[in-house]
Amino acid sequence: MTITSTQVYIALLTALIPAFFALKLGKELSK
């Protein structure tokens, strides 16, 4: 099974988007 750059990009997005929202939510709650 070969990993293409597109699959890496999608994997990064799926990892980063929830992390970004969690960070944004955490900043809102700490105010």
Curated annotation (Swiss-Prot):
SUPFAM superfamilies: Subunit XII of photosystem I reaction centre, PsaM (SSF81548). The keyword Membrane applies. It comes from the Eukaryota. GO terms for biological process: photosynthesis. It is found in: Plastid, Chloroplast thylakoid membrane. The chain crosses the membrane at residues 7-26. Keywords: Chloroplast, Membrane, Photosynthesis, Photosystem I, Plastid, Thylakoid, Transmembrane, Transmembrane helix. Pfam families: PsaM (PF07465). InterPro entries: PSI_PsaM, PSI_PsaM_sf. The keyword tRNA processing does not apply. It is a single-pass membrane protein. Its main location: plastid. One of its GO terms (cellular component) is chloroplast thylakoid membrane. Belongs to the PsaM family. This is Photosystem I reaction center subunit XII. The lineage of its organism: Eukaryota, Discoba, Euglenozoa, Euglenida, Spirocuta.
